[in-house]
A protein has these predicted regions:
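N-terminal strand-loop-strand
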Residues: 1-31
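Short, charged helix-to-loop "capping" segments that act as catalytic/coupling loops
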Residues: 12-17, 56-62
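Unchanged
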Residues: 34-61, 67-116
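Generic alpha-helix detector with strongest preference for long hydrophobic helices that associate
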Residues: 2, 17, 27, 64-66, ...
Length: 116
């Protein structure tokens, strides 16, 4: 089975920070991402998942191609994750209950944090 996910490297341009979401279930930080729904493009899924998890509006930077990671999940599933570079455009009115706590981290400090 192939799983497709999409998300954003959500950037605050003026402060040169990137958003990370805290996941209680795993006790770690991650970039906002999730499953691509049927009939949805990778870009649409990335914007939706970012809004759901952060309550922020993501504007994809079209000049950059998405970063694509292929990996095997712990259950042995083949997963492709499409990560887009995006600018934070402010608060979203998304009412999804999947919202996580977010932190804004300077680019050079991202790898000092427990990431998955």
């Amino acid at each position: 089975m192939i799983i497709e996910k999409a998300g954003c490297f959500l950037i605050r341009k003026e402060t040169k920070e990137i958003a990370l979401v805290y996941r209680d279930k795993y006790n770690d930080y991650s970039f906002p991402k999730g499953h691509v729904e049927e009939g949805e493009s990778f870009k649409e899924a990335a914007i939706r998942e970012t809004a759901e998890e952060t309550k922020r509006i993501a504007q994809i930077i079209d000049e950059y191609k998405p970063f694509v990671e292929n990996y095997t999940t712990p259950r042995g599933e083949n997963c492709f994750c499409y990560m887009f570079f995006a600018i934070d455009k402010g608060k979203s009115d998304n009412q999804c209950e999947d919202t996580h706590d977010i932190i804004w981290t300077p680019f050079d400090k991202v790898y000092d944090i427990s990431l998955v």
